[in-house]
């Protein structure tokens, strides 16, 4: 039998898509924890700027997101869903298709949140008190946009080297 080139992808379903009410279609990958009759955390990974498109394996392999399905991580969370949505272009796209500095916000902000809410509702054993969102660079930007727009929805965030410029964060947003 032939060996798989990327066996670390075996635990993920990389064939999922979601079309939001605004018409935006996302490809996404998901990892489902073992069924254990318990509520499980949801960890959301948002990719960097060069990883948009329609192939979520790029997101998973680009930053070793596959480790989130590994035994060590899953044991720490006692089982966790992993959701890795892929923007059609990049999270910092304001609708022009060009990389922008963040002052206008992302054209994907509302449709991404719709995807997340729909995903949570369709997986009843997700613990809504343990929804964690993060990503690096461009994904860190969208992490910041999500937590600033929906501060009560996410339990925690891990924006890594986020591209969100401080000048666009108000004191009121920080306090919320």
What are these regions (language model features)?
Residues 38-42, 78-81, 127-131, 151-156, ...:
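Loop/turn elements at helix/coil->beta-strand transitions in domains of secreted/extracellular proteins
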Residues 155-176:
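The feature captures the conserved acid-bearing segment of alpha/beta-hydrolase catalytic domains
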Residues 85-86, 134, 160-161:
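Alpha/beta-hydrolase-fold catalytic nucleophile elbow
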Residues 1-42, 80, 138, 164:
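A domain-start/cap signature at the N-terminus of enzymes
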Residues 96-137:
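Gly/Ser-rich "nucleophile elbow"/oxyanion-hole loop immediately N-terminal to the catalytic nucleophile
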Residues 140-151:
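Short glycine-enriched nucleophile-adjacent loop
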Residues 42, 49-109:
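Active-site machinery of serine-nucleophile hydrolases
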Residues 49, 115-123, 149, 153, ...:
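Structured segments of extracytoplasmic/periplasmic soluble domains
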């Amino acid at each position: 039998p032939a060996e798989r080139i990327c066996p670390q992808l075996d635990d993920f379903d990389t064939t999922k898509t979601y079309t939001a009410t605004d018409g935006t279609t996302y490809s996404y990958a998901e990892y489902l924890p073992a069924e254990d009759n318990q509520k499980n955390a949801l960890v959301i990974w948002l990719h960097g700027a060069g990883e948009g498109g329609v192939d979520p394996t790029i997101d998973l392999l680009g930053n070793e997101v596959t480790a989130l399905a590994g035994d060590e991580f899953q044991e720490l969370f006692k089982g966790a869903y992993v959701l890795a949505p892929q923007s059609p272009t990049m999270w910092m796209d304001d609708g022009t298709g060009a990389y922008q500095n963040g002052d206008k916000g992302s054209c994907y902000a509302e449709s991404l949140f719709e995807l997340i809410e729909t995903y949570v509702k369709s997986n009843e054993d997700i613990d809504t008190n343990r929804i964690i969102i993060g990503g690096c660079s461009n994904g860190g930007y969208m992490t910041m946009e999500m937590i600033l727009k929906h501060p009560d929805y996410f339990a925690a965030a891990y924006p890594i080297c986020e591209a969100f410029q401080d000048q666009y964060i108000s004191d009121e947003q920080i306090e919320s």
